[in-house]
Amino acid sequence: MDPLVLGLLVAATTIFILFSGISVANGLLVVSAIFLLAFDGFRSLELIPEVLFGKLDNFALLSIPMFILMGAAIASTRAGADLYEALDRWLTRVPGGLVVSNLGACALFAAMSGSSPATCAAIGKMGIPEMRKRNFPDGVAAGSIAAGGTLGILIPPSITMIVYGIATETSIGRLFIAGVLPGLLLVSLFMAWSIFATWRQGGIDALAGRTFSWKEKFEVLPRVIPFLLVIVGVLYALYGGVATPSETAAVGALLCLGLAIIIYKMTDLGTIWVMLRDSTKESVMILFIIAAAGVFSYMLSSLFITQSIATWIGTLEVNRWVLMLYINIFLLVAGFFLPPVAVILMAAPILMPIILGAGFDPYWFAVILTINMEIGLISPPVGLNLYVINGIAPEIPLKTILTGSLPYVACMVIAIIILCLFPGIATWLPDLLMGQAVT
């Protein structure tokens, strides 16, 4: 059978199996086993265990459970609430200070936890009631936190970037740096829209800040600064080449766990057990998807599907930006239905030869891909962040949360357009700090 036709058959079968309710990892294994057995015989099928475990035999993968534990330690404390409170007190005189504080807190907590749902929950519990109390529109209150939570997969340290780096064999440290300026761009766009939307809907009074004494401003800092110093240290170790991502993540997790115990008195063994249990579950889920995606990629390569698609794309007489438009549409649709890790592991091995062949920078593309995945986090039918916000603020209808999030989707699309027009936003800082990339 022609590899391109076989590729369409694989895609259709994968969609059918994943929509049947089976987990992503098991679905990828089932599809891989079916097609290897049908078109390559038992010889390839027997190699599945070797590929499965071989994919996990990677030192860089150790950073995933460590960063997850680091985020869980922070999320198990009041660090998010304290961070929000600190920014609110210090930025109260800034125009639209509260919404700026919320989004700033989302960005910083995302850098500390690396988790979008955790960011939504931690900042939303404090931010949404306070914004409603100060007469911010419900759509702005819910939408800004839902959108701010998505920054967890872009702003370093990001599990999504680690997975992309492993899937495409690119530098994880460089990927982290590539996400910094685009992350700040997104935060700026989110802030601009939030302030404009509040002003447009007549919420002028909501933009006026409260007054805090210097004592009130300084008393909250001792609970926040230690965590921020850990994050700065982690990023310095990564960017400065002091340690590998896995080593840095392990030290960061240990320090955050220690700070949670010392500062927030998290000494209850039950709480620590729940934190370790949930971190382990999330880590195993991601690692299982990575292993299954390795088998899926092996199947695509063994049946010459990946190579045939790349060759076919290369023969098309199409402008490379038109090609990028099609890729963005594909990623956007995939992000509506699948978690970011699954999309990256399934799509990156196929798309990377196409991206390189078209002359695009793989680190710039990582940012584009991640922003597309962010859109999926606040878009139905999955829209995980929407449901997190609905869970912590049930008095706000889900429809209001969704409509309030749509302008932030537009902000992300604008960010993608800006990055396409000015790719240096994603590539300048990595080139400055780590030298020119070799692709």
Report residues per predicted region.
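Alpha-helical transmembrane segments of multi-pass membrane transport proteins
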Residues: 1-439
